[in-house]
């Protein structure tokens, strides 16, 4: 019992020191805690794969509105599938894309991460809410096919806006599902991806550090948005405030750390509208930040289920 209390006290002190000195600017950098690591890496934060998938989703949404009513359906569906299933080629980023007053650093997917797709991280269970007795992934393929045949992504008969349906569905079936039902569920158990071992061979971060980071990546926040009000977060997502987005002042917005994607964008949109009585944006961001500080404070020791 004494040792357990001592360990908890040490963790609390470490969190206080980390929070006041090294991590005051937001989510990272976080130091290497993996015991036995002898390389030159100093920051353990890594979630570029999740950012790549957000970009794939945004590009897919943009493509969903490019149909001309059937004439380009086959070619458009093939292009949309390359963003859903992934491609060996370095796909151009269709969205988000630079515009006047808001310059994006990356122009192609491999500049963020290679070998990523949406389909491999998509909910695969039954989806009875959609006609046809389909799985979750089959519904996505059906939506893509219908969007490719539509005129500008709109089905006049049903009123379906395929771009919106595909985007919202993907946010739930990929980003939310992966974060909540994978990285913050099974992979937070004491035995799965333990904190006293690397996430996989050859990396410099622990199993728990990376599991937490990947969940944060699916949340879609800018790493430096700590303390931002919802309006500022919303403006970054809408590409209307480069000054707030450009943390390092290089004149560009780095999609890997300075941009705001889907789930965080919608949290900010709710917080800034209506009665303004919610604070989803900062509550969730701060929970991720505090959790990462606690994992870092464990200093590479194993964490139990209760911890």
Task: Annotate the PLM regions.
Residues 25-307:
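Mature extracytoplasmic or organellar-lumen-exposed domains after removal of signal/transit peptides
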Residues 2-23:
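Gram-negative bacterial Sec-dependent N-terminal signal peptides
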């Amino acid at each position: 019992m004494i040792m357990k209390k001592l360990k908890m006290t040490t963790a609390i002190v470490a969190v206080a020191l980390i929070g006041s000195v090294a991590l005051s600017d937001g989510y990272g950098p976080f130091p290497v805690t993996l015991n036995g690591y002898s390389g030159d890496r100093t920051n353990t934060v890594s979630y570029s794969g999740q950012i790549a998938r957000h970009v794939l989703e945004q590009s897919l949404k943009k493509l969903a509105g490019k149909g001309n009513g059937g004439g380009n359906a086959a070619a458009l569906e093939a292009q949309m599938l390359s963003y859903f299933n992934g491609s060996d080629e370095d796909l151009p980023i269709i969205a988000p894309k630079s515009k006047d007053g808001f310059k994006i650093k990356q122009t192609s997917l491999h500049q963020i991460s290679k070998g990523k797709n949406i389909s491999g991280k998509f909910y695969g269970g039954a989806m009875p809410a959609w006609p046809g007795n389909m799985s979750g992934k089959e519904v996505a393929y059906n939506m893509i096919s219908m969007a490719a045949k539509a005129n500008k992504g709109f089905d006049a008969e049903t009123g379906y806006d395929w771009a919106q349906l595909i985007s919202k569905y993907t946010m739930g079936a990929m980003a939310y599902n992966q974060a909540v039902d994978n990285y913050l569920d099974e992979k937070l158990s004491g035995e799965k991806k333990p904190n006293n071992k690397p996430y996989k061979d050859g990396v410099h971060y622990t199993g728990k550090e990376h599991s937490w980071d990947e969940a944060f990546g699916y949340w879609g926040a800018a790493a430096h948005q700590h303390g931002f009000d919802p309006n500022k977060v919303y403006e970054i997502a809408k590409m209307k405030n480069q000054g707030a987005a450009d943390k390092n002042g290089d004149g560009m917005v780095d999609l890997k750390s300075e941009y705001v994607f889907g789930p965080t964008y919608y949290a900010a949109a709710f917080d800034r509208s209506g009665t303004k009585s919610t604070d989803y944006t900062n509550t969730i961001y701060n929970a991720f930040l505090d959790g990462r500080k606690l994992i870092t404070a464990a200093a590479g020791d194993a964490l139990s289920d209760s911890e």
